[in-house]
Regions:
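Boundary at the C-terminal end of the N-terminal hydrophobic targeting segment
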Residues: 3-5
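Short beta-strand->alpha-helix linker/helix-N-cap micro-motif
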Residues: 7-77, 91
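Amphipathic beta-strand/beta-sheet edge segments enriched in Tyr/Trp
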Residues: 71-138
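Residue position within the beta-strands of beta-propeller blades
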Residues: 88, 153-158, 169
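Structural motif
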Residues: 95-99, 162-169
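Structural signature of eukaryotic scaffold interfaces centered on beta-propeller domains
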Residues: 133-151
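Multi-bladed beta-propeller domains
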Residues: 170-176
Length: 176
């Protein structure tokens, strides 16, 4: 539930305009962590979930409590809940950083279709969020064949009361 609460923080919202098509339901099974990765699981899951919602390519389903899912993907359960795609994730400690393991499952056919391992730095590293955004973009590519936009940055200027202009760079989700 902490991940859902943090995902609802106000921020920048981006919209895309393209041909209206039905969006497949995508579920995110609660991520797990091991070998020290448990400390980052909530942050990573929140970023991935927000990125997939902002991609506007899926109808991202609300998460279900971790206690209702096991270590093995229950395709029947996810199918009953209406999911077409399912993302599973695990964060593992690896030396100086972490490995994020993401897997895309086709719930309709009951099989894993893509799996990737992504190196991510510690959560205090300035590149942490961008590394997770790049992993999220891979999920979009796996499911749609089109690149994701989460690893994009937005640059803008603001003028203060004295007429000075400041340049700002933020992630596509409004952070940083």
């Amino acid at each position: 539930m902490l991940a859902q609460e943090r995902d609802s923080l106000p921020g920048v919202s981006l919209g895309l305009v393209y041909e209206n098509q039905p969006q497949p339901a995508l579920a995110i099974q609660p991520f797990t962590g091991r070998f020290g990765g448990a400390d980052l699981v909530d942050d990573v899951e929140v970023i991935v979930g927000r990125d997939l919602r902002n991609s506007d390519r899926f109808e991202v389903m609300d998460s279900i409590p971790a206690g209702l899912v096991g270590d093995v993907v229950d395709y029947t359960l996810w199918d009953r809940l209406g999911a077409v795609w399912l993302i599973t994730g695990q964060v593992e400690g690896a030396g100086e950083g972490y490995i994020l393991i993401l897997e895309l499952h086709d719930v309709v056919y009951g099989q894993s279709v893509e799996r990737g391992r992504f190196r991510i730095p510690d959560g205090t590293d300035p590149d942490f969020r961008m590394a997770v955004h790049r992993a999220s973009d891979e999920i979009v590519t796996w499911a749609t064949g089109d690149p994701g936009m989460a690893a994009s940055r937005i640059v803008f200027t603001m003028t203060d009361n004295q007429g000075n202009k400041d340049l700002y760079v933020i992630d596509s989700d409004g952070e940083n």
